[in-house]
Amino acid sequence: MSAKIIDGKTIAQQVRNEVAALVQKRLAAGKRAPGLAVVLVGENPASQIYVASKRKACEEVGFVSRSYDLPMTTTEAELLALIDSLNNDSEIDGILVQLPLPAGIDNVKVLEHIHPDKDVDGFHPYNVGRLCQRAPKLRPCTPRGIVTLLERYDIPTYGLNAVVVGASNIVGRPMSLELLLAGCTTTVTHRFTKNLRQHVENADLLVVAVGKPGFIPGEWIKPGAIVIDVGINRLESGKVVGDVEFDVAVERAGWITPVPGGVGPMTVATLIQNTLQACEEYHDINENRVKGQ
């Protein structure tokens, strides 16, 4: 029996439509549109594609989108100065600095320089700490997007044995925190994990984010499991595949995300959600205080 497909494209479009409707309500009430600043340093082709998709999504929902395409020669001090300016800009609710940054610029220093209230990627230590303390504010986009997929498909998670393959700061670690919040018993595996197969075979819910095509053989999947494949890998043939051997896994799993069209669209949709949230929860309040003075 083939698994049911978790269609990230459809759910992402639903999310964007919902945000667009809320933006129209804001405008009708005399409020400003949310604003997102997207900063790209250098000319990494993959980064340019990601940034273009984010800018397009902003325009689709009616956000104010500001683009800052900086040359590869940009210094760390120049980038931090731009972030300072955006932190103090009352029309900007979210600041996104596209990673990776060129050599010589400290990723951590740059991300920590973004004000937590404008950290719509959810990478600032304050926002990660809030998630860890079970009181999340702006949440990392890919993990939150995955949770949204599970919720929209009414897939129950309480009591499941969840396994996350990959322990990156962007996906694996925050994903484990999201799964704990969702009531799962959660295991995180990484490059030092012994007997990975045993962990995967015991997973009721499997999230794989390692960036290696077909890293998890389909035969390892527990029958009926929920499989979330975060990987996006382009083969020499040009075909895009995930981190899980899809053709075999789809015959064993109960639910599975395809690649492409699964998790990827949700990352951008969640960025849009986070920007609206930052606008309404943080900056509307501050603007009202200023008007009341």
Swiss-Prot record:
HAMAP family: THF_DHG_CYH. It comes from the Bacteria. GO terms for cellular component: cytosol. GO terms for biological process: L-histidine biosynthetic process; methionine biosynthetic process; purine nucleotide biosynthetic process; tetrahydrofolate interconversion. It comes from Yersinia enterocolitica serotype O:8 / biotype 1B (strain NCTC 13174 / 8081). This is Bifunctional protein FolD. The keyword Manganese does not apply. Catalyzes the oxidation of 5,10-methylenetetrahydrofolate to 5,10-methenyltetrahydrofolate and then the hydrolysis of 5,10-methenyltetrahydrofolate to 10-formyltetrahydrofolate. NADP(+) binds at G166, A167, S168, I232. InterPro entries: Aminoacid_DH-like_N_sf, NAD(P)-bd_dom_sf, THF_DH/CycHdrlase, THF_DH/CycHdrlase_cat_dom, THF_DH/CycHdrlase_CS, THF_DH/CycHdrlase_NAD-bd_dom. The keyword NADP applies. Its EC number is 1.5.1.5, 3.5.4.9. Homodimer. It catalyses: (6R)-5,10-methylene-5,6,7,8-tetrahydrofolate + NADP(+) = (6R)-5,10-methenyltetrahydrofolate + NADPH; (6R)-5,10-methenyltetrahydrofolate + H2O = (6R)-10-formyltetrahydrofolate + H(+). Gene3D superfamilies: Leucine Dehydrogenase, chain A, domain 1, NAD(P)-binding Rossmann-like Domain. SUPFAM superfamilies: Aminoacid dehydrogenase-like, N-terminal domain (SSF53223), NAD(P)-binding Rossmann-fold domains (SSF51735). Belongs to the tetrahydrofolate dehydrogenase/cyclohydrolase family. Keywords: Amino-acid biosynthesis, Histidine biosynthesis, Hydrolase, Methionine biosynthesis, Multifunctional enzyme, NADP, One-carbon metabolism, Oxidoreductase, Purine biosynthesis. Pathway: One-carbon metabolism; tetrahydrofolate interconversion. GO terms for molecular function: methenyltetrahydrofolate cyclohydrolase activity; methylenetetrahydrofolate dehydrogenase (NADP+) activity.
